[in-house]
Swiss-Prot record:
This is Alpha-amylase/trypsin inhibitor CMb. It comes from Hordeum vulgare. It comes from the Eukaryota. One of its GO terms (cellular component) is extracellular region. PROSITE patterns: CEREAL_TRYP_AMYL_INH. Disulfide bonds: none annotated.
């Protein structure tokens, strides 16, 4: 029969391996989608302007949605919420946003639309939460976010 210390050591080893496996699953590197010098999600900018600001963009209306949803679908599930936060940008740094202040369509209106891009009525894409929703999309929540960053 194994001694108590051997059983404790085995239990500790099992727990460490479980925690390591869980950490590896949730540690997708989202840097490529949040550290780019170019405007993130360029097709989504057109789609947001169409839907939130009623601005006509080049091409048929469905094309902007199709391209935006395609760009979002190409981002790993674990990184979609973080990429949308990066696209929205901080209010204090509008120059680092994919959104522009437009006459009659402030960034806040556009940000409200960005928050729902992954939902069933729009792109219907799962996120880090295994649902088509992003939690903690208000800037004051970003430091306490549920998505990895």
């Amino acid at each position: 029969m194994a001694s108590k210390s051997s059983c404790d050591l085995l239990l500790a080893a099992v727990l460490v391996s479980i925690f390591a496996a869980v950490a590896a699953v949730g540690s997708e590197d989202c840097t490529p989608w949040t550290a780019t010098p170019i405007t993130p999600l360029p097709s989504c900018r057109d789609y947001v302007e169409q839907q939130a600001c009623r601005i006509e963009t080049p091409g048929p209306p469905y094309l902007a949605k199709q391209q935006c949803c395609g760009e979002l679908a190409n981002i790993p599930q674990q990184c979609r919420c973080q990429a949308l936060r990066f696209f929205m940008g901080r209010k204090s740094r509008p120059d680092q946003s994919g959104l522009m202040e437009l006459p009659g369509c402030p960034r806040e209106v556009q940000m409200d639309f960005v928050r729902i891009l992954v939902t069933p009525g729009f792109c219907n894409l799962t996120t880090v939460h295994n649902t088509p929703y992003c939690l903690a999309m208000d800037e004051w929540q970003w430091n306490r976010q549920f998505c990895s960053s």
